[in-house]
From Swiss-Prot:
Gene Ontology biological process: antibacterial humoral response; defense response to fungus; defense response to Gram-positive bacterium; innate immune response; killing of cells of another organism
Name this protein carries in UniProt: Cecropin-A
Domain of life the protein comes from: Eukaryota
Job of this protein: Cecropins have lytic and antibacterial activity against several Gram-positive and Gram-negative bacteria. Also has activity against fungi.
Tissue: Hemolymph.
Compartmental location: Secreted
Amino acid sequence: RWKVFKKIEKVGRNIRDGVIKAAPAIEVLGQAKAL
């Protein structure tokens, strides 16, 4: 029962880390398109 919850928590953390790392790259791409 707890293993499933821990697994979901781990996946959520990975997604959040990915978004945090991707955000600057997305901003740079947006600025590049604006130019």
